[in-house]
């Protein structure tokens, strides 16, 4: 919105500002309606609906782990918001506004804990072989910038099995503009939720990867979420728990926050009930748009998008989490939709996508999924 001086702040200016504000509100309302339309599990809604993005998975058949590659056709700009206390990233520092690097060529989301970041060079190799990257001024050398982020899934199966460079290369080979598969695939293969009370008879649940998109005329916003949290997954519209910590007797959800309150009141502070969770949870969020934005603007959009996950995960950003949110622009269209509008719509889309991540998941041994339990209030 154009900034008005005091002298220009007259009735005409007020009318102009009011008209613009009405347009922004109209955009928000249209966006919320589009999000509601995609709130189910329709396979047509995907981050790959954003022009300029291809995505693919590699899912390891030996244990629940894998990786997901996002490849950008043309010059993509990105910003990030790291609100978790222990994020695992590869070249993530390049997304800071102060970095001179303005373009990235790919992103790899991977399981395997910190060691899983060793997979990222496989995506770099794939892009280099396809002549994607910065011209380094050396004959036939191009340097692709691939940002990596990791979740901890080492407790599922044999933790010595992790995504490696070959796994990332295969994820890139499978990348397409088609609808991206959801659930126990790629980096979502080892995602779980509701782990904050683990080790005390309470049990978490299987989660996965979810994706969704919305369109506002020529502007497209997409989201991808890997829900791998210490906290419960909550429907922000009803307050009901969709997936999370289950009671030791198997009769419903524990409700982590209420359980923590009850133990605090009972004076059980000498036990491990009230200690911080181990470093075993990280939720990864990617939002993308074809609307043109700078790295600084995308950093703010990432901050706003992160609040969407906080509406659906409780508690979120615990001391043991590495929660990370990325915002990407493929710079295909110029739009008058501002940072706050895109950020608000992205946050709502992220909330819906968190729910998709758990609803699309399938049970594995010891980790039931929401779809396999009796219907809950969420």
Where are these regions (language model features)?
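N-terminal secretory signal peptides and thylakoid transit peptides that target proteins
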Residues: 1-25
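Signal peptide processing junction and immediate N-terminal pro/mature segment
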Residues: 24-37
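Alpha/propeptide regions of enzymes that mature by internal proteolysis
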Residues: 14, 35-378
């Amino acid at each position: 919105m154009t900034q008005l001086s005091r002298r220009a702040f007259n009735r005409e200016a007020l009318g102009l500002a009011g008209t613009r504000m009405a347009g922004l509100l109209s955009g928000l309302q249209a966006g919320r309606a589009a999000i509601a339309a995609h709130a189910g599990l329709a396979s047509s809604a995907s981050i790959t609906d954003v022009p300029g993005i291809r995505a693919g998975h590699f899912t390891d058949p030996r244990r629940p782990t894998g990786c997901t590659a996002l490849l950008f056709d043309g010059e993509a700009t990105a910003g990030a918001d790291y609100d978790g206390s222990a994020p695992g990233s590869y070249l993530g520092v390049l997304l800071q506004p102060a970095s001179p690097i303005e373009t990235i060529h790919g992103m790899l989301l991977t399981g395997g804990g910190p060691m899983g970041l060793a997979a990222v060079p496989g995506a770099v190799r794939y892009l280099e072989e396809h002549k994607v990257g910065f011209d380094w001024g050396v004959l036939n050398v191009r340097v692709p910038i691939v940002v990596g982020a990791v979740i901890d899934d080492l407790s599922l199966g044999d933790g010595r099995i992790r995504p490696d460079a070959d796994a990332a290369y295969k994820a890139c080979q499978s990348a397409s503009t088609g609808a991206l598969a959801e659930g126990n695939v790629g980096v979502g293969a080892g995602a779980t939720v509701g782990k904050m009370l683990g080790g005390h008879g309470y049990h978490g649940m299987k989660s996965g990867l979810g994706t969704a998109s919305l369109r506002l005329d020529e502007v497209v916003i997409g989201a991808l979420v890997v829900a791998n949290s210490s906290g419960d997954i909550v429907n922000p519209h009803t307050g009901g728990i969709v997936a999370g910590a289950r009671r030791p007797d198997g009769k419903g959800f524990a409700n982590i926050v209420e359980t923590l309150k009850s133990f605090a009141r009972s004076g059980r502070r000498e036990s491990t009930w009230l200690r911080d969770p181990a470093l075993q949870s990280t939720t990864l969020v990617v939002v993308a748009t074809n609307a043109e934005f700078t790295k600084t603007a995308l950093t703010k959009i990432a901050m706003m998008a992160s609040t969407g996950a906080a509406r659906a995960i409780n508690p979120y950003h615990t001391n043991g989490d590495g929660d990370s949110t990325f915002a990407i622009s493929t710079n295909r269209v110029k739009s008058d939709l501002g940072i706050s509008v895109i950020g608000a719509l992205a946050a709502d889309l992220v909330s819906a996508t968190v729910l998709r991540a758990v609803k699309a998941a399938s049970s594995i041994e010891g980790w039931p999924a929401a779809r396999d339990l009796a219907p809950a209030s969420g």
